[in-house]
Swiss-Prot record:
Gene Ontology BP terms: mitochondrial transport; negative regulation of transcription by RNA polymerase II; response to hormone; response to vitamin D; sensory perception of sound; thyroid hormone metabolic process; thyroid hormone transport
Signal peptide residue numbers: none
Subunit (UniProt): Homodimer. Binds the thyroid hormone triiodothyronine (T3); T3 binding inhibits enzymatic activity.
Gene giving rise to this polypeptide: Crym
Keyword set, alphabetical order: Cytoplasm, NAD, NADP, Oxidoreductase
Organism: Rattus norvegicus
Source lineage: Eukaryota, Metazoa, Chordata, Craniata, Vertebrata
One Gene Ontology term of the molecular function aspect: transcription corepressor activity
Name by which UniProt lists this protein: Ketimine reductase mu-crystallin
Length: 313
């Protein structure tokens, strides 16, 4: 008799993925394999997006198979603009893990924790390769879930002397600063927050540019994580064109990233090409890593969670 699939709640996923840093080695390998094309053994189409215009939302479907992990997953993610509240968040996600040998469903797990932690871990990988030498000042724009997950791993992996925070709603920025470990300076404007910063993380809901090239220190590194639709932006044309542009997936960036499409900026490399050594990391120049998120990243995290859960049964 076939066993029923396991269901792992957000709390259970969190228990088996306490530190985003655990994801860094397998994610580096997965990024490198993805950027090798078919030879890397990663099968991953660009996400399918189903608009729900009547309710200002969309459903995204993100499947992947990785030969290295011998894992098969798909993530279902919904986003509903302007519907964020305590009862129903704007972003919701579930990850389905299958047995790749026969297609049976092994587990359904909450995808929100996975999304937050794998996204932050990939930003940390990009920063490891692209941040300028002697980086002292970290700036985070946005105070949502991704701000917390990025702060957690960035303070684990790097030694910044100052962390700055800006959010459109100052109350949420102050809540962030008071709830995390360590000192965070809340800034009144984006310009104040980013001036002189070595590493900038944009995790906002902006649909128009909020970060302008004239404010950015030459040689700074920017992780652009928000603006996941082709008509949304966080960065202006000047910044996108003056920086060396890295992406997680060329194909996805040229279909989904408003920052890339609307600026006409040229993509220099995928992050996986930097990890593998196929392309250089220009850490002495201003760099942008445009992160859209990839299904293989969810796969790596889901496999790690499931293996940990299975071993503890």
């Amino acid at each position: 008799m076939r066993r029923a699939p396991a269901f792992l709640s957000a709390d259970e996923v969190q228990d088996h993925l306490r530190s985003s840093s655990l994801l860094i080695p397998p994610l580096e390998a997965a990024l490198a394999n993805f950027s090798k094309g078919p030879d890397g053994g990663v099968m991953q189409p660009v996400r399918t997006v189903v608009p729900v215009a009547k309710h200002r939302g969309f459903l995204g479907v993100m499947p992947a198979y990785s030969a290295a992990e011998d894992a098969l997953t798909t993530k279902l993610v919904t986003f509903y603009e302007g519907h964020s509240n305590n009862a129903v968040p704007s972003h919701q996600a579930s990850v389905l893990l299958f047995d790749p040998s026969n297609g049976s469903l092994l587990a359904v797990m909450d995808g929100n924790v996975i999304t937050a932690k794998r996204t932050a871990a990939v930003s940390a990988i990009a920063t490891k390769f692209l941040k300028p030498p002697g980086s002292d000042v970290l700036c985070i724009l946005g105070a949502g879930v991704q701000a917390y997950s990025h702060y957690e791993i960035f303070t684990e992996q790097f030694s910044f002397k100052e962390v700055r925070m800006w959010n459109r709603t100052r109350e949420n920025a102050e809540k962030f600063a008071s709830s995390v470990q360590g000192d965070v300076r809340v800034c009144s404007s984006v310009q104040e927050a980013v001036t002189g910063a070595d590493v900038i993380i944009t995790v906002t809901m902006a649909t128009e540019p909020i970060l302008f090239g004239e404010w950015v220190k030459p040689g700074a590194h920017i992780n652009a994580v928000g603006a996941s639709r082709p008509d949304w932006r966080e960065l202006d044309d000047e910044l996108m064109k003056q920086a060396v542009l890295y992406v997680d997936s060329r194909e996805a960036a040229l279909k989904e990233s408003g920052d890339v499409l609307l600026s006409g900026a040229d993509i220099f490399a995928e992050l996986g090409e930097v990890v593998s050594g196929a392309k250089p990391a220009y850490c002495e120049k201003t760099t942008v890593f445009k992160s859209l998120g990839m299904a293989v990243e969810d796969l790596v995290a889901a496999k790690l969670v499931y293996d940990s859960w299975s071993s503890g049964k």
